[in-house]
Amino acid sequence: MKRLLLLALLASLPIYSDTVDFDWTGLDREIISLEAPLLIVKASKGFIGCGYINVNACLDEACATVNGVNTHDEMLTATISAVSKDAKKLGINVGMSGAEAVELLR
């Protein structure tokens, strides 16, 4: 009886989803499985990447980074932590969301 009550209780709980409602059309998502995943979202004008990326090495590339993410969806809600010179020219700034940066990179 206790198991049935527990199952009924668990079934009534809301399901949490960390997915973000976002149009990924025209974007390439890359992941390399390492201890922490290496993540890239590439758009037509540049890309955002995880903390593995050094924006100072992005010569003539518009790139920005976010930290502490494990999925592409988390990249969208994370705050941009570093920006290359070319990304700054597109209006991408430290502190904006990953989703805002991706839209400027489309």
Regions found by a protein language model. Name each.
Residues L13-S17:
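Sec/Tat signal peptide C-region and signal peptidase I cleavage site
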Residues D18-R106:
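Residues that scaffold, gate, or flank divalent-cation-dependent active/transport sites
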Residues L4-S12:
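Sec-dependent N-terminal signal peptides
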